[in-house]
A protein has these predicted regions:
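Core beta-strand elements of the Rossmann-like FAD/NAD(P) dinucleotide-binding domain
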Residues: 2-4, 306-314, 396
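N-terminal Rossmann-like FAD-binding beta1-loop-alpha1 element of flavoenzymes
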Residues: 4-31
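Short hydrophobic core segments
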Residues: 7-9, 32, 290, 309-320
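Conserved N-terminal glycine-rich FAD pyrophosphate-binding loop of Rossmann-like flavoproteins
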Residues: 34-73, 189-201
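Dinucleotide-binding Rossmann-like beta1-alpha1 core, especially the glycine-rich loop
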Residues: 48-152, 163-169
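Helical element adjacent to the flavin cofactor pocket in flavoenzyme catalytic cores
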Residues: 164-170, 208-229, 236-291
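Flavin (primarily FAD) binding-site architecture
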Residues: 317-334
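Short FAD-binding loop at a beta-strand-to-alpha-helix junction that anchors the flavin cofactor
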Residues: 391-407
Length: 407
């Protein structure tokens, strides 16, 4: 049996937030995770009230602050977890992000009275986010400058040309004064630099020799330019956090990465910093897969794959949604697999399909990549204390909580 007061299932950003809050309250915390989840696939930025339908004009020249976007989301979607926080929404988001971002130590602080960070994605699209890793370039810091997009020889070099052309076109369409132009980068000759991938360049930048070669290559390619900014692929280190700052100090211009939304150096940095933050907070870690969670009126039991059972004063599900397995499709049904909690969409329990063939997954996930599907809004319902609810809207157990994307 566990000696922890709190068992957190999942070690992504939500699991970190839950663990830190419990530790700050004086609890003994054990975090259970068997593998990297969705956070490992995350890019180097996240939002608090994103608008995927925002036009380039809205992105380059936003009119709403993050605070206003938060309040609008809570007002317009009464089933969103934000709506449960009522008048305390803004302060709750501010305080929780301040704690988590400080613990991670590689992200910009959250400014709810601002417009967030203006980023470029590796798909050549401008995006606003609430915060981003320091290694990522904030285009908002160069409102009237030329921005060079570094093109490195090797696999995927054509993508950088596309990013430069796409950003230039979208900025012009939005009437923005920033100018984007591709800049070929010629790395210093080195045997191990033969057509490396961006993640290999990122690992190379972790070494003093690799960073020195990168400094030389960028300096030579810039040719003494001290105006504007330099946008590069996600390659500014994995295990060290000062690469971007060193480049900026040496070159005299802003240098930063595009946001890469799939697995890569930015996700690896986040996972590394989560591990460090949990350790520094005094949380115990168990690399163990949870087989089942049994909610009872007398308390919740967690059973590991090896048969060991754990109990605590509280169990917090921070298992994510579809990508990390917090919700799965079984027999055509969308289910929460560990505790058997009902799945809710827009405040209503997702009823079981009556057909023996199960549910049409297209009805759950949709057929258009540009529209939110019911499954994207699906999750576990909680009460105002974040206790997970059963099909009748009552707490499933007195000590079983849920948080994060699982909601």
């Amino acid at each position: 049996m566990s000696t922890a007061d709190v068992l957190v299932v999942g070690a992504g950003v939500a699991g970190l937030a839950a663990a830190l809050a419990a530790r700050d309250a004086g609890a003994r915390v054990t975090v259970l995770d068997a593998h990297a989840g969705a956070s490992a696939l995350a890019g180097g930025a996240w939002d608090v009230a994103s608008d995927p339908a925002a036009s380039p004009e809205d992105v380059f020249r936003p009119t709403r602050t993050l605070r206003e976007a938060l309040l609008t989301r809570a007002r317009d979607d009464v089933h969103h977890p934000y709506a449960k926080l009522g008048a305390g929404l803004v302060e709750a988001v501010r305080a929780s992000h301040a704690r988590v971002l400080a613990a991670l130590a590689i992200y910009r602080p959250l400014d709810l009275d601002g417009h967030g960070v203006l980023l470029a994605t590796d798909l050549g699209l401008p995006r606003r986010a609430a915060t981003a890793q320091h290694a990522i370039l904030d285009l908002g810091e160069s409102p009237h400058d030329g921005i060079w997009v570094g093109v490195f020889p090797g696999p995927r070099q054509g993508e950088s040309h596309f990013v430069a052309a796409s950003l230039a076109d979208l900025a012009a369409h939005a009437g923005d004064s920033r100018r984007f132009e591709a800049l070929p980068i010629t790395p210093a000759a080195h045997a191990s630099d033969t057509l490396p991938h961006p993640h290999e360049r990122a690992a190379s930048a972790d070494t003093d020799a690799g960073l020195a070669r990168l400094l030389d290559a960028l300096g030579a390619s810039l040719g003494g330019r001290r105006e504007g900014a330099l946008l590069v692929p996600a390659m500014l280190g994995v295990t060290r956090d000062d690469v971007a700052a060193r480049l900026r100090a040496h070159l005299g211009i802003a240098v930063g990465e595009v946001v890469a939304p799939l697995a890569g150096p930015q996700g690896l940095r986040l996972v590394r910093r989560i591990d460090t933050a949990l350790r520094e907070a005094g949380c115990a870690r168990r690399s163990a897969r949870v087989r089942a969670i049994e909610p009872r009126s007398s308390g919740t039991t967690v059973t590991l794959e090896d048969g060991e059972t754990l109990r605590g004063k509280a169990v917090i599900l921070a298992t994510g949604k579809h990508t990390s397995g917090g919700l799965v499709v079984r027999g055509g049904e969308l289910v929460e697999p560990l505790a058997g909690l009902p799945v809710v969409v827009d405040g209503r329990v997702l009823l079981l399909a009556s057909s023996s063939a199960g549910r049409d997954t297209a009805a759950l996930f949709g057929t258009s990549p540009f529209r939110a599907s019911p499954a994207s809004r699906a999750g576990v319902a909680t009460d105002d204390a974040h206790l997970a609810l059963d099909r009748d809207g009552r707490p499933r157990a007195p000590d079983l909580y849920a948080c994060g994307a699982l909601l």
